[in-house]
Amino acid sequence: MRRTPLYESHVSLGAKMIDFAGWEMPLQYTSINDEVATVRKNVALFDVSHMGEIFVEGEDTVEFVDYLLTNSFKNLRIGQVMYTVMCNEMGGIIDDLLTYRFGEKQAMLVVNAANIEKDFDWIVNQSKQFNVTVRNLSDQYGLIAVQGPLSERFLKTFVSDIDSLSYYTFASYSVFGKNCIVSRTGYTGEDGFEIYCHWDDTFTVWNELLQRGNNFGVKPAGLGARDVCRLEASYMLYGNDMDETTTPLEVGLSWVVKFDKDFIGKDSLIKQKELGLQKRIRGLEISDRRIARHGMYVFKGEKRVGVVTSGTFSPTLEKPVALAMLSSEIKISDEIEVDIRGSKVKAMIVKLPFYRGSVKSS
């Protein structure tokens, strides 16, 4: 199992460690609910160094990345970040990712940890007709997410001009004397920043953040809290809510699909749009405190209408919530049932997101 540069710190902080995509990662330090509360009310630090960084460089960078991804990279300004998906020819989602535009000839694609090798191979294979070089530099970067409504106020105490960074933009900063890329991005639904450090600098930056954060109430948070926060904010998780058998139109990501340009999978998505969706992701609020988990079936009367893709108890909303891939006949406010360990539990279809936090609008 692989370890991030912060492994020793996680162990010394008493983290419960788990295997996540072949990485030994912290699930929680204290309790998941406490860590979620820290994210929602103050500032939490996450180690997300297991994420992948793939660089595309060369004369055709803009043209190639624009073709590779569903969202419009050509329209992205230098210093901007873009959320997007990468599809196969059938419109199935290979991965969802963040794309950073460094210039006319360089882009960074930040991909999910479980998909690094798959994504890299796909990108290399698609690049052969373009004048670009594709490099997997995941081993050279650590990544720390600083998340919560007070993130800017905290970081401003040692990075003076951090408030000039608007939502979904990035810049180079000196953080505790280390050269870092900092973006105003995150996966929690709160305002926040992600700090890309050289692998060997990550431990120093993390430790300084923890020490400076002592008087600020800043605490580390694990993957458990990260998953609850993203689900409350209704952010999709690759491998649970979407994969190569689902399209961006089915999982509520039509806003990252730009049909006015060419991209891999465009023809298939146009056809799906014209024919109409057979299934789509919906939000569920469960009637009692039982949790609907991934893989549990959803019923409307006696008819099975779909399956739960993600579910948890939301400490912020004080009720269980879930995402489910359901037949398109199921609408907002419909009452349905989830088969939870052999008993059918009532639930209602609700509008997403479940929770809106302090995340800045673009």
Swiss-Prot record:
UniProt GO molecular function: aminomethyltransferase activity; transaminase activity
Known catalytic reactions: N(6)-[(R)-S(8)-aminomethyldihydrolipoyl]-L-lysyl-[protein] + (6S)-5,6,7,8-tetrahydrofolate = N(6)-[(R)-dihydrolipoyl]-L-lysyl-[protein] + (6R)-5,10-methylene-5,6,7,8-tetrahydrofolate + NH4(+)
Keywords: Aminotransferase, Transferase
GO cellular component, one term: glycine cleavage complex
Pfam families: GCV_T, GCV_T_C
Functional note: The glycine cleavage system catalyzes the degradation of glycine.
HAMAP family given in the database record: GcvT
Gene Ontology biological process terms in this record: glycine decarboxylation via glycine cleavage system
Subunit text: The glycine cleavage system is composed of four proteins: P, T, L and H.
Species name: Pseudothermotoga lettingae (strain ATCC BAA-301 / DSM 14385 / NBRC 107922 / TMO)
Designated name of the protein: Aminomethyltransferase
Similarity comment: family membership: Belongs to the GcvT family.
EC numbers for this chain: 2.1.2.10
